[in-house]
Amino acid sequence: GPALLKYGTHEQKLHFLPPIARGEIRWCQGYSEPNAGSDLASLQCKCEDKGDHWLINGQKIWTSYADESDWIFVLVRTDPKATKHTGISFILVDMDQKGVSTKPIKLISGKSPFCETFFDDATTPKEHAPGVSAIVGEMNKGWDVAKYLLTHEREMISAGGGGLLGGRGMGEVAANDIGLENGKLSDPELVIKSGEDALDYVPDLRGAGRRLCRRC
């Protein structure tokens, strides 16, 4: 949601934000790779332009709940000749397709919240719907989108229970505050406006996070 609100086109927002707000689709994050963990910009997951679609090959690791997700936002290398922090794009991929597979990573606790995610000649259309590009932000500038999203996540975490959700789960917010049938955000234009207002609130979250951390 935050990446689309900041970098998404109007068409991307109208297509994706309403079902996100209603809790109808679940996303996972495809950043880390087996050989690109702390040095994320060295990622090698390759995305080739094939005219009317993208062809993705590579692997991601530590993908939280990838086996239960509907979509994944992935950092891919679209220009192998560019410098390390450039030539990376931020792409949205449907998990339910040929060429995309997951393998849960079993932890010592016996639980498997993380997965390996594989892309083997995975085909992603240039547009998921008319005018709805698979790429978020500018081509080869996905690093900017990723940095913004990581910063946003840290601010939400630092705010703790005093954040936008007030300590509640996303499902509870969707059911009680938004509603799946007659929700307040059934109007997609209102979804976009509400998201933009939330972004304006981020500086306040940053201050709240600092105050909370000082008390720890």
Question: Where would I find each of the regions flagged by the language model?
Answer:
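A structural signal for short hydrophobic beta-strand segments in well-ordered beta-sheet cores
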Residues: 45-48
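Structural signature of FAD isoalloxazine-binding scaffolds in flavoprotein oxidoreductases
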Residues: 39-43, 124
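A short, Trp-centered hydrophobic/proline-enriched beta-strand micro-motif
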Residues: 23-31
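Glycine-rich beta->alpha junctions and the first turn(s) of the following alpha-helix
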Residues: 100-216
